[in-house]
Amino acid sequence: MRKTLTVLGSINADHVISVPYFTKPGETLTGQNYQIAYGGKGANQAVAAARLGAKVAFISCIGSDSIGKTMKNAFAQEGIDTTHINTVSQEMTGMAFIQVAKSSENSIVLASGANSHLSEMVVRQSEAQIAQSDCLLMQLETPLSGVELAAQIAKKNGVKVVLNPAPAQILSDELLSLIDIITPNETEAEILTGVEVADEQSAVKAASVFHDKGIETVMITLGAKGVFVSRKGKSRIIKGFCVQAIDTTAAGDTFNGGFVTALLEEKSFDEAIRFGQAAAAISVTKKGAQSSIPTRQETLEFLEHA
């Protein structure tokens, strides 16, 4: 029987435009290839996990608008349990305004909308879903009070808690003590620990700060350099795959969804990381957020030929 992953997080309608470079203050640029795509860190990670083979339930909020309803239907078609996606009346679905530069880097501005309603009250309504899960995966695009309560419910019921602390913000020691696995990138690790992560040595220092807060496993994603892992007194960098990137928008989300999926299938940590890395590597070779997330079959074939 497949284990259950519950994802708690955001849903955004992504307004994406390609630009030659990011604008400077006071500058106007003409962009190209404008499109509206489905995104939000929570949604991206839920879709990634579902596409890659996980049994996923998604706790989230949408607005009382047509894009929210359309997105909820799309998640159901991905095989995601949408029972816990709440519709907030007289509110818009969250939005993200994304610039993608020629370098393939992206710059994102968020309008929270319905995401700001993912409160303790909404989480409490989904308590039974969290309690019966095998793993809870969260990010930080929704209110911290809801994230903290979900982590408390999970911990009380022996559910593994994975936090992708993005976008980065200072977190309480109480919340950090409830996390089993944390997956920041270099910037997020620095904001949370005060240690600038530039190499393996500094990553070890940052990881020790997380370990001191009670987090057993620290995984710092290093972009093209791979993933730094620290657990059970040992640390190492697991190198990524070399691909021609054209859009990195959902790379981190795809990695998190893939990693947790493989972990729930009883894969070793290294195997789970490689699976997540392979899925993320494929995603950066395509444009868009959820549209770039590969299927399980694509990912397995990529690993076979890597």
Curated annotation (Swiss-Prot):
Keyword Chaperone (UniProt): no
Residues at which substrate binds: N12, A13, D14, G40, K41, G42, A43, N44, E141, D253
Cofactors: Mg(2+)
SUPFAM superfamilies: Ribokinase-like
UniProt-annotated location(s): Cytoplasm
GO molecular function, one term: ATP binding
Residue sites binding ATP per the record: N185, T221, L222, G223, A224, K225, G226, G252, D253
A Pfam entry, by short name: PfkB
Activity regulation description: Activated by a monovalent cation that binds near, but not in, the active site. The most likely occupant of the site in vivo is potassium. Ion binding induces a conformational change that may alter substrate affinity.
Keyword Kinase: yes
GO cellular component: cytosol
Top-rank taxon, per record: Bacteria
Gene Ontology biological-process entries: D-ribose catabolic process
Subunit structure: Homodimer.
Protein name: Ribokinase
Organism: Haemophilus influenzae (strain ATCC 51907 / DSM 11121 / KW20 / Rd)
Biological classification of the source: Bacteria, Pseudomonadati, Pseudomonadota, Gammaproteobacteria, Pasteurellales
Gene: rbsK
